[in-house]
């Protein structure tokens, strides 16, 4: 048994093993579903999702059919063995007091190499089960790299493991919905500031539309 979407040769062996084990966990306990893989984007891109839970990063990773990259607190790399492990599954250290510029440069480098970077543009886990205001930096990243954003809606994690819960429920239902990529070329005619603002607004609308699509029964074309 394996995810139907898992390709034969787009993941290194360790990453693939971790992804499969995690997918199995979410499939058994949370009946995890994936929608919108017809919106798969070739080349460097940000995959930008709502953020309600510690479960969101693994759900995003198991739902996308190729390797993705995360930014992680530098302190997590201090242990030799754990640090080696999370590096092997594509986590990149960022200092707790790192400037936005250092984070920006790390993401730009990954995108320029044609990689997918998983991010949560709210900047933190939400307090309520709704999308918080997005940080403006995501528009700047796309304007700088001329790449794309794939909007993502993650369902179910707020109820299972939100900020008020010390431990997750071992039941529930999760889903991950990928939307139509947001392309730089559609904003290239605007001046830089306008483009950044419009990209951020478009992403916010897209994530909310994906949620609406899912909650209305997950039927019809995915926006």
Feature-to-residue mapping (PLM):
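Non-catalytic C-terminal accessory region of glycerolipid acyltransferases
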Residues: 1-10, 14, 102-223
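A transmembrane-helix-recognition feature enriched in membrane-embedded lipid enzymes
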Residues: 2-36, 59, 80-89
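Short, basic, glycine/proline-bearing loop/turn elements
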Residues: 21-22, 88-94, 121-125
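Hydrophobic residues at beta-strand termini and immediately following loops
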Residues: 34, 71, 92-94, 152, ...
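Short amphipathic alpha-helix with an adjacent loop that forms part of the alpha/beta core around
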Residues: 36-40, 108-109
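Catalytic core of membrane glycerolipid acyltransferases/transacylases, capturing the structured
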Residues: 39-98
